[in-house]
Amino acid sequence: MPAKTIEEKLKELGYELPILPSSKGIYKRCLVDGNHLYVSGHISVNTDGSSITGKLGKELNEEQGKAAARQCGLAILSSLKAELGDLGKVKRVMKLLGMVNATAEYEKHPIVINGCSELFVQLWGEDSGKGVRSAVGMGSLPGNVAVEIEAMFEIY
């Protein structure tokens, strides 16, 4: 029996790739350099493309933050699919930079970004789905979004 594709795993997990909002700046969503693919920061969006907003430690709790980070991961996957045509061309996750819109007192940024990291491990497994990572707090993010994540992947 052949291994499940990433798209099949997403469907099995009940996830749907979101519609990406239009870019607000002058940049590329993805840039391929050899066997590396760099992904610009992706904001927390619902499946319909609307933003998930709010500040952790004020309007949003830890679970809502994790869900927002997972949605960032799904948005990143939307861009990967648009760039590569097939998520099976991703060999492994190399790096994530997770930025959390949080109050000065909030301290659980890594737990929030786990929402994205857990998704990628579910899809690619422990070895290929887990890369190096930073999780930092921000005083604000564009449009008051809850989370923004940028990523780097190794591709085939």
What annotation goes with each model-predicted range?
Residues M1-Y156:
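Short, polar/acidic, helix-capping and beta-turn segments at strand->helix junctions
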